[in-house]
């Protein structure tokens, strides 16, 4: 019997949702950064086995939105919970149930799907703290499955996959065997550039940046990519470019290497920086960048 279904991965920012997905898929498919709300779009990645196909919906973290982009991210996260077969609630072994977790669990109560408690980063805690965490979270919500893991080390990840398959129903193969993501290459390249910018800029520039791919074409076994990093302030533009252009050069070089690894071809990459004030509150700009503005 072939089983298939959709699984959403949800939790507070920085609990390791993207790291978990990356380990399962063996590819850097979801942007990984230490900054909250670094996943913006609803990305579907596909894991196909001999007797199953799991379509993962990697959603933005739940938070209180402060602009239209934030509203979009929260809307995507909430909608995904009503369209899946299993929800993985990922948290960390902090003993006490966090306020942010209580907010998400309250949302999950109305989802009417099996919810797994996935306690990540068990390699960074003690057995006593882990046991206390499992006890407190079990009392706060009725989970179908409880599994402690280390997404970074891969501990218990195979067991987690087995449990997901167990809860899926008989169903069709939604995607071809060799398909692992439902986004186009341009989207992935834009995410790679944005991830590098977030990583190198540290706390100097917040989340007010986006990446637009102006051109991406393949010629003679080589890709030519031109992109713009969009920011909200002139001061941010200066920081992104850096003294003598050093910061932008660092971002470009690192992004180019990752792009070459992803595309498996040589890449010629040029990146510019453009100021677009308050772009996160502009429905038009959000639409141009692929973010649909939430309906009122």
Curated annotation (Swiss-Prot):
Stretch list, region G5: 149-151
Molecular-function GO term, any one: GTPase activity
Domain Era-type G: 3-170
Compartments in which it is found: Cytoplasm; Cell membrane
Region feature G2, mapped onto this chain: 37-41
CC per GO annotation: cytosol; plasma membrane
First-listed, main subcellular location of the protein, grouped into a coarse class: cytoplasm
PROSITE patterns: G_ERA (PS51713), KH_TYPE_2 (PS50823)
Membrane-protein topology: Peripheral membrane protein
Ligand binding (GTP): 11-18, 58-62, 120-123
One of the GO biological process terms: ribosomal small subunit assembly
Region (G1) residue spans: 11-18
A Pfam family reported for this protein in Swiss-Prot or TrEMBL: KH_2
Protein keywords: Cell membrane, Cytoplasm, GTP-binding, Membrane, Nucleotide-binding, Ribosome biogenesis, RNA-binding, rRNA-binding
The KH type-2 domain, residue ranges: 201-277
HAMAP family with a match to the protein in the record: GTPase_Era (MF_00367)
Task of the protein: An essential GTPase that binds both GDP and GTP, with rapid nucleotide exchange. Plays a role in 16S rRNA processing and 30S ribosomal subunit biogenesis and possibly also in cell cycle regulation and energy metabolism.
Family: Belongs to the TRAFAC class TrmE-Era-EngA-EngB-Septin-like GTPase superfamily. Era GTPase family.
Subunit: Monomer.
Protein name as catalogued: GTPase Era
